[in-house]
C-alpha cells in the first residue's frame, strides 16, 4: 500500500494552477498497486536495442520528480517501468505501447518520463523569458506540452492528480498551468489557461472534440511533445476517429509527438498506427499471457473426467512430439506429478519430474535439458521460481493454478520463442507454440474467466461458451453475495471498466418481483436523483393496459405499519447471508435493508461486529452502501414479507451528451433542481417499457398538471426533452438495444407469466358477469342471498327499510295533496324534495356494495391486491378484539370495485369531543354529499369530467349527535360530534379504505398527557396528594424515550382516559 508522508504540507499549499473547482487530492495521486497484478517479469519487443534499468538509482529523472516519488512511497521499480522509463526518455520518435492488467503500475510506466519532459520544456521556456524579452502570447507557446487522453471523468481526475503531484515543485511560474482538466461548465477560464500555456492537459476524447468545436480557430498545439492514450482499449472506434480528425487540425504537419498507448490487451491495428508516427516504437508486456497470444501461441481448452486427462496428454504428445517440441507439463503437486509420470512411462515417454525435494543433481539434469531436450518431458509445479526456462514450445496444463496470475506466469516458459512483430523483418515462427488446458470437475471453475479472455482474441467454440455460462450461474448462486448489476450496463448496455467489481451476468434475482407492475403507466413520487436518467421513486398509482387507474398502498401508512411490526428490543443479526432482509440501525434511524455481499466468515459460532457487509436500502431509498455487521438486527418475519417502499426508475437509451460514460455531480444537481422546482399541484407519470432487476425502465418521465381553464390534464414537463435541450443526454438506440438484449431472458419469462395470468382472468370473467346479472334482476332478494357477510346484510336491510319508508311517505303525501285543506298543503310543501333523490342514491350505493361483494367471493383467493389483504390481517392483530361485536369476527371478503366506482382514500383521528375524517379526492371537480343518519355515515362524490364515483358507508358504534363538513382543495373534512367526551374504541378494522392519521393521534395524545401531568403536579403542589418522586422520574424518562422514537405508535393511542 502506498502512503503519503507529507500530505498536510501539500494540501496546505494548494496551487491555483489546477482547474477551478478542483482541489489536489492525495487519494487520487496515490493509487495502491495490486500485488497480484504487478508482475516481476516483462516481455519487451522493439526495432532498436532496449536498455532497461535494474535499480531505482539508475533512473535519470529530475531530482524534484524523484523526491516527490519517494515522498509518495514509490520506491519500488517494477519490471514494466524499467523498460518504459529509459525508452520514453529517449526523445522524439520513441513511442511505446504498454500492455498490462489494470492496477499493475502501467499508468506510472509513462507519467514520470512525461512529467520529466514537461518540466524540462517549462524550464527552457522560463530561461528564454529571462534572457530575452519574450512575448507570452506568441503562437508557438499555445497549448499543452503533453496531452493525455483517458476514457472517463474518473480517470481524468486520477491522472491529473498524479501529474500535478510530480510537477508541483518543478515549476513556479503562475502564468503556466501545470495540470489542466477540461471544464464541465464550458467556462472561458479554460481557454485562457490553454492560451497561456499548459504542462499536461488531461481530457476524454469527447472533451477534446468539444473544445475544438467551441474554438476551432484558436486551438493549436505547436509545443506538443507527448500524446498519450491511457486505456485506449476502452475508447470506442468512433471516439478514436474523432480524436484523429481533431489532432490533424491542431498539430503542425511537420511535427509528430511521442505517442504512448496503454491497453489491457494487445491490438494489431493500434500498434500499426503507433509505428506509423514513431520510428522507434517499443511494445512492453506486463501481462505474460497477452504476450503469448501476441507471439503466436495457440491455446486449446479440453473438459473431461480426471481419469481421462492422462490420455489427453498422450494425444497432445503424439501431435507435438517431444523430440521436436520442447515440452513442459504443469501439475498441481508432487502426488499429481507422480501419477502422471507413471502413466507417461507406460507409454514409453521419458520424463524429468522436478519435485519439491529436488536436489543439485536434478538441477543439473534440468540445465542439460535446457541445452538439449532429447525428447525428455519436463514436469513441474507453480512453486518452482528457480526454473529459468524461456525456450519451451509446448505447455500442457494438467492441473490449473490456484490463481489467475500464476496461470498467466506459466507462459513465461515460451517467451524467448515469441515472434517479434515490431521489427519490420520479423522472422516467421518455424515451430508453432501450443498451450493445452485440461479441465475436470476439480478445476472447472477456472473456465469462465479463461473463456472471457480468449473471446477477446480468438473465436471460441460455442459449446465451451455455454458451459462457461452455466458454471458462472452455479457459482453465482453458491457465492455469498448478490452484487448489484454494473451501472454502465444499465446506462450504456456494456461495461468498459476492466476492474469493475459489479455483476455483469443475469441472475434469478433479476426477475420482476410481484409488487412491481409489468406494463402500463405509473404515477410516482420522486425520492432521490442518482443521475439524469436514474431515480429513486415510490409508486402511487398504476394504470394497466386497457384499464383504469388503481391506487397503490399509501406509502406513509405502509411505512407506519412496518414500524409497528418492529421488535422493540431486536436481536443481533448473525451470521449475515446474501439476499436476506434485516434491519439497519443507526443513532437516529431504523430501516430495512437487503444484504448484497458478505466478507468471508471464518467461524459462524463467533459473533463479529466489524465484519464488512454491503447493503441496499429498501424503504428510505435504494442506495447501496457498506457498513459493519454490528449495526444489523433481525427483521420480523411479517416485516420481511412487506414489499419495499422504494424502487429504481431508469430511462434506457439516453447516454451522456458528450460521449462520456458517466455524469458529473453538477449534472446531477441540475436535474435535481429541474424536478424539485415543479409547480405544487403536479404529479410525475411514466410509461413502463419493461421491468428487471427491481428497476422500472420507462419511456420518459413527465410532469402533468390539471388546467382549470381547459378542464383537462396537460403535460408540463418532459424530462427527456428537457435533458436534450440542456445538452445533458442524447439518444442512443444502440445502447437501448443492448440493454434490452441483456435483459431478454427475464423479459421473455415475464411476458409468459403475464399471458398466463391474462388467460386466467378471462376464464374467470364469465362467472362475475353472471353474478352481476343476478344482482341487477333481483335486487329485492338481497336479504336471502347466503354469500352476504354481516356488514352488507345490515346495509341491505337498512336500504330495504328505507325504500319502504320512502314509498309510504310518498303515498301519504299524495293523499294529502288530494285533500282541499290548505294548511296541510303548506306544511307538506316545507318538506325538502331532495329526500327522494337522496334515498335513491343511497339505495344505488348499497346495491353496488352488495353486488361487488358477491362478485369478489366468486374470484380466486389470490389476486393482485394481496397487499390490501395483508394489511387487513395486520389491522386485525393491532386492533383490540374486545371492542368489536361478534359479527365482525366473520371473515370479510375483499371488495373489487367496478370500473366507475371506487373507494376514496380516507384518514381519521379523534379528539375528546369529535371524530375527524379527511377524504382525499383525486381531482377538484367532484360534487360530494355527506350524510349522518343515526349511526350510519354516508359519503358519495361524483366527478364532473368522468363517470368516476367515490363512495363509502360506515357504521359508528359510539354515540354521536351531529356532523359538519367542508372541502378545501381536493380534501373533504368531516367532523362528527360526540355525545360523550370519551375516547371511541374505533373498531374500524372491517373498513379497509380507512387509514389512521397517526400524526394527529400523537398530537392529541400528547396534549391529553400534558393536561394530566399538569393536573397531577397541581395536586402535588397543593398537597392534596402525596408527592411520588420515583414515579415521576420513571414517567419523565418514559416520555423522553417516546419523544426520541419517531414514527412508532404509542401504546396509549386508543386507550380510554378517566378524567
UniProtKB/Swiss-Prot annotation:
Q: Which residues form the Tudor domain?
A: 575-639
Region named Disordered: 756-787
Question: What is the E.C. number?
Answer: 3.6.4.13
Q: Which residue ranges does the record assign to the Helicase ATP-binding domain? A: 87-284
Concerning Pfam families, the annotation shows: DEAD
Top EC category: hydrolase
Q: Please tell me which stretches of this chain the record labels as motif Q motif.
A: 54-82
Name of protein: Putative ATP-dependent RNA helicase BoYb
**What would be the name of the gene that encodes this protein?**
BoYb
